Amino acid sequence: MNNVLILCHRRGWNKLTNFILGLKKLDYRVTVVSDEYLTGDFNQFGLDKADEVCINENFNVEEILLHTPTADIIYSISENLLPVQSQLEKHYGLNNVSEYAAEILSHKDKFDTYCRDIGLGKYVPDSIVPITPSDLNMFNDRAFVIKPTIGNGTKRYGTYSNLEYYGFNNKADFLKYLKLNNLDSFFDDNVEGFIKPNFNNVKYRLIAQEFLDGTKGSHAPYTYIDHDSEVNLLWWFKMEMIKSKDHTERFEEQVYKVSSIEGDIEEELTNNILYFLTTLAKELQLKNIFTSGPEFFSNLKMFDINPRPGNGMNICDAVNDNKIWPQILSEAKADIQNHYVWQQVQLKPGKVKEVGDTSYLTQYADGQRTRPKIEPGSTIPEFSFIVDPDFCFPIITSGKNRVELGETVIRQLQDSISYY
């Protein structure tokens, strides 16, 4: 296996950082197909290390085949590109992801239904694509979240962007929000579906999914499913969420801390997560594919399997002298010597009057994000989320005292700021 083809949207370039480097260390020839070319980000995310980078706005299979007539393995960095991968694999004589598997893995509603059909229903949150208000009766006055059936929690788009990845306390609050915001055509529009240009123009609808409270923390694995459809556990990580409310009907919950876990997690949770993944891999006959999840909660329900490399894999590689990716790719394991904490900085909100020296932050900054300016006159929001285009401020700490170090860095920054 010498020729690697990577399918990646421009917005997913951050997941290529160190991944391409790891492949090159093993002497693979790497071709990246992306939908956009931005010179300023090219070197930052490691694309300069690829042998070729081809721009194909619509990921047209015929055009990709003309340029790249052969490949030994394909990695999709976004699940909505799995259908493209499955079509290419037929031409290349590969069988890692079938067209059927790609369809299941790239649509949340189809994934939930499939899991129920193969006996994994107890792990799947209640969900439905609502086309009438009565469809929401299934939640019995419980909270639920509205999501596109494709994509992830950082990409909102279109008429209903103010619904996507937001939670509602119950059906009544959701209907009230629709009325207050002149979104009465929601159910009719959801029958027809929507198109996202930046998701390869795949038609999707909006799904209502049982709200799983992540403020108490959830656990997930990074895994590599090998050529025998065996699930190889790489390491566990914990996710912690923060919940905000912008008014009485709608709330938002987003990740603010992700920590790699040293050792194992609770046995029952381990057994259930690995059973879920093993069953799925065997039933769909998945091969040579990464997963960044699924994320499991204390009630043993899950969401978002994320069948692709995750950002934490690049972070782990970076804080371990770029030794992790080559090990994963060659041995399907990860010998982690240096664990990490990634967290969104949460600061006291308000208008900044003065700020001291912050140059020390450079060594902790997530280099894949543009650090917001904290300067006299700038405003610090009440909550800092990764989806916030104006104030996304994550830091990375690693080593034995990584937790305490992160707390110290944030406290030092907070103490250096005065407010009006």
Pin down the residues of each PLM region:
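ATP-dependent carboxylate/phosphate-activation module, predominantly the ATP-grasp catalytic core
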Residues: 213-279, 306-335
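Glycine-rich phosphate-binding loop of ATP-grasp-fold ATP-dependent ligases
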Residues: 144-190, 218-220, 241-265, 313
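ATP-binding N-terminal substructure of ATP-dependent carboxylate-amine bond-forming enzymes
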Residues: 1-101, 404, 408-419
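N-terminal beta-alpha lobe that positions the nucleotide/phosphoryl donor
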Residues: 50-53, 61, 67, 71, ...
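Phosphate-binding site of ATP-dependent enzymes
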Residues: 175-245, 268, 295, 299-301
